[in-house]
Amino acid sequence: TEGLILLNHGVFSFGNTARLAYSRMINLVDTAEQYLVNHNAWDVERSLNKVPTKSMHIAVAQLRKGISLVVGSPVLLNITNSERGIDFSNRSDVAEIATRGPVTPDHVIRTKRIPMIGRDVEKFEQEYISYFKTNEPNAKERKTMLDAAPRVILDKEFGLCAVGKNMSEIGIISDLYEHTIECIHRAEKMGGWQVL
């Protein structure tokens, strides 16, 4: 056995040495990448959407304040200004595909389960609390709800935004969600985005 592919999750490679396992990983990833290219799912087309402007400062400050109140302490809000984030935020189906869940369960540690679509912080907070109250009783061990504020925002005007206590945290969240966007785009081209 050279490797293992877990549906909707990832690739694992094996070998008697680290070098052999790594070589097999490269071969498996190259094969997968070529498959995506051959099925027109590698290159993601993007439209040219306008990046955020300075006139949005008040709206950004109000949004950051609303999120800070839910967190219970001041947070930073960063508009990534990435073409990928703006384009994805302006998809007609963004509310449906972006809220199916994370690429991998461990992303929720940084990004929360789903992004906030638009700027309705109160709605996101209520839905987060409701989700927790519905699902916590089913957990094997008791869970403590963290703050109900978003960490990722997808907004038609702002594009992709990340929320965190410092720029290091925001950078990690932004990177994770930029990767998530690429995964969703490619999966949609291959028959539909699904989470584990």
Indicate where each model-derived feature is located.
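Active-site histidine-anchored catalytic micro-motif
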Residues: 1-3
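Histidine-centered catalytic micro-motifs
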Residues: 5-11, 109, 158
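Short acidic/polar capping segments at secondary-structure boundaries
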Residues: 10-12, 17-20
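Domain-length cofactor-binding catalytic modules of enzymes
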Residues: 16, 23-196
